[in-house]
């Protein structure tokens, strides 16, 4: 039996940053924990980013992941929103880097394809499949489901990246 690899998935957001931790042992995936980081709404932008940075750093210290998967930011019709989302993503990635965690980035379409089988799945379909793949995870918010989906995607792709020395 192979040594389990612990993976932290992050679904970044300024209001809600989802996170999920799984372990992969061979083809088997096991749920460890999940949740949502909710910075107080009365904080300034810089304070929210600091809150995300601190919380993700604490998750990395507490769960000691071998690797992390972070969802990439898509630039949509609202570039201002995409920029803000990118800042939250940067805060999370910086916290992971400071904790010495290898980070892999995945496009939303790639995550959905890995978990649901189609890159156009909606959030409810992703949550449904995450709960099927990780039955011990129980009930969760959509942001946590997206983060667990990112961790599952990382589990599917990290072995190949580790062989290449990219992770």
Curated annotation (Swiss-Prot):
UniProt-listed InterPro entries: RNaseH-like_sf, RNaseH_sf, X-over_junc_endoDNase_Mg_BS, X-over_junc_endoDNase_RuvC
Stretches assigned to coiled coil: none
Binding locations of Mg(2+) 2: 71
Chief subcellular location: cytoplasm
Enzyme Commission code: 3.1.21.10
GO cellular component entries: cytoplasm; Holliday junction resolvase complex
GO biological process annotation, one example: DNA recombination
Keyword Magnesium belongs to the record: yes
Active site location: 11, 71, 143
Protein keywords: Cytoplasm, DNA damage, DNA recombination, DNA repair, DNA-binding, Endonuclease, Hydrolase, Magnesium, Metal-binding, Nuclease
Amino-acid positions noted as binding Mg(2+) 1 in the UniProt annotation, renumbered to this chain: 11, 143
Subunit structure, as described in the record: Homodimer which binds Holliday junction (HJ) DNA. The HJ becomes 2-fold symmetrical on binding to RuvC with unstacked arms; it has a different conformation from HJ DNA in complex with RuvA. In the full resolvosome a probable DNA-RuvA(4)-RuvB(12)-RuvC(2) complex forms which resolves the HJ.
Biological function: The RuvA-RuvB-RuvC complex processes Holliday junction (HJ) DNA during genetic recombination and DNA repair. Endonuclease that resolves HJ intermediates. Cleaves cruciform DNA by making single-stranded nicks across the HJ at symmetrical positions within the homologous arms, yielding a 5'-phosphate and a 3'-hydroxyl group; requires a central core of homology in the junction. The consensus cleavage sequence is 5'-(A/T)TT(C/G)-3'. Cleavage occurs on the 3'-side of the TT dinucleotide at the point of strand exchange.
Similarity remark: Belongs to the RuvC family.
PANTHER family referenced in this protein's UniProt entry, alphabetically: CROSSOVER JUNCTION ENDODEOXYRIBONUCLEASE RUVC (PTHR30194:SF3)
Protein name: Crossover junction endodeoxyribonuclease RuvC
Species the sequence originates in: Hyphomonas neptunium (strain ATCC 15444)
Taxonomic lineage: Bacteria, Pseudomonadati, Pseudomonadota, Alphaproteobacteria, Hyphomonadales
